[in-house]
Amino acid sequence: MANEAVTIETPTEFAVYTVADGTAIPLNTLMKLSGDFTIIASSGKDVWGGVLWEEKTISDGITRCTVALNGVHDLTCAASAVTLGSQVCLSGANLIRVAIAADLLLGKVIGKAEEAGSAGDIVRVRVGAT
């Protein structure tokens, strides 16, 4: 996978969720909630699940992983620009976009952009801030 988050300020809030044993997920992957207390790698306009805080190796017997719920991370913009101060949400595999009103209602906002960026740019995001 590409475009994993780069942690700038260490998170202080974490959660533990269930993951599939037969899945490999790189460290710092943006995760989505896919079911009750279950996460998988983000793939679209998904409900925020956190930043994977530990690498998950395929078929290693581990079915629970820790995710960071806050902190400051460098994240990659999807096909559209992100404006300074805007709330952002998932937009694909390890990609973000500007959140719209419906994203707020559905729990998809992941944080606030602390810098602006165009498509494909890396921007700093304060995860957990609204």
Task: Place the predicted regions along the sequence by residue.
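Surface-exposed, low-hydrophobicity beta-strand/loop segments enriched in small/polar/acidic residues
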Residues: 1-130
